[in-house]
Amino acid sequence: MSMESATHAVRARLLDFTGLGYRVAFEIGDEGSITIDASGTTPEIVEDAGGDEDADCVIKLSMENFEKLIAGTLNPTLAYTLGKLKIEGSTGVALKLAAMLDD
């Protein structure tokens, strides 16, 4: 999956992040990053924001695991436990995001 495809996949699920109330960055291997800014009323995407220092939570994972996460075939909690993704910043925000991805 390319970064363009990854961004499209997130954009397709963007409304799922309404009410998150935070800014979350996905650092996807060496490919780049996608930031979801859901701190306002309407979630927005920023592609390749350089890891986004303003993010409340940064989730680091491979493109393969990102694709599975967005598709709903990778359990975020299990992926964290197994080391398939790493969290920097607020774990609480990551848990809230995980619940939104499971819906």
Q: What do the predicted segments below correspond to?
A:
Residues 1-103:
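Feature captures hydrophobic
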